[in-house]
Amino acid sequence: MNQENSIVTRSDLCRRIESLPQVNIGHYPTPLEPCPRLSEALGGPKIYIKREDCSGVAFGGNKIRQLTFTIGEAMYQGADTIVHGATAQSNHCRQAAAVAAQLGLKCYLRLSRDHKSFVQGNLLLGHLTGANVELVDAPFGPELDVVK
């Protein structure tokens, strides 16, 4: 049987994940919080919310899980700078800038300007973490698809 068709066990998967370069930046595991009123309103299924906002870096969020590996790989390869681009209020860029500051990396953020690009929220936090922030008129993400 070739490797593409082989079954990967949980222990195999854990071993493979653990072998990847990563940085310890999150506070895990994040808690599960019961939602009894929502459960009752929906007729009984027990509903829980995973509290990724408790992951610890720059007000938390699920992006920290990805950055654990992408920045881990970058550092493994000797990078001293990270570059991210998205919209001005990007959660991912906010967290990337905070992680870079925490780890002593330089950070450049290239963010698309919009009519609401006041220096507040995630854009302000990018500045406060010491990232080099450049606002550009070029679109990113779904906005870019519209331009195409």
Q: Where do the protein language model's features map onto the residues?
A:
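PLP-dependent amino-acid enzyme catalytic core
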Residues: 1-148
